């Protein structure tokens, strides 16, 4: 049997075109390196939408431990990832717990080691470095070994190139690359982007997505007309 035929979605009895069950941890039969993250991740302050997957040769089960770093519950920052995102091996989300106070001459965190070094520490010098929640939109592709810094917002439909370091917000349907990542190309013209954002196909009922896969996978925006664009 060819490798292509072995990578068969594990639909577990669902009707054709209904797609895989988003609550299955490993949706591709005989390919356990790919996993839907929503049923795999139970860590506090991490929210992940349906059908978003992570691909790792060691398995996706340790995504929260391996890929979401310095995420401490007492800080309260959230990682929010939308639906239908593709996250490649080695992608990292650096959370606000990694930040150091930068207003003084030294960035060394003396206070965390105690033994008197905590005396006189002003928590405000650290808390003002908090960047807020990290938010990834829907239908975002994050390439291998990409690094997403604290508080970044990545728009719907964006692509983050492999090994990029994303330090600023990414517009919807932009392709960013580099360290620090910059927009190298917009995937579509402004009119098309507006139509896609209005349609928000990722929020459609799953049966409607299945019926319209050719349009979603295609690039002909002229076929996206009401009532096709409505979620019902």
Question: What are the language-model segments listed below?
Answer:
Residues 39-46, 73-74, 78-79, 133-135, ...:
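Short, recurrent motifs enriched in small/polar residues
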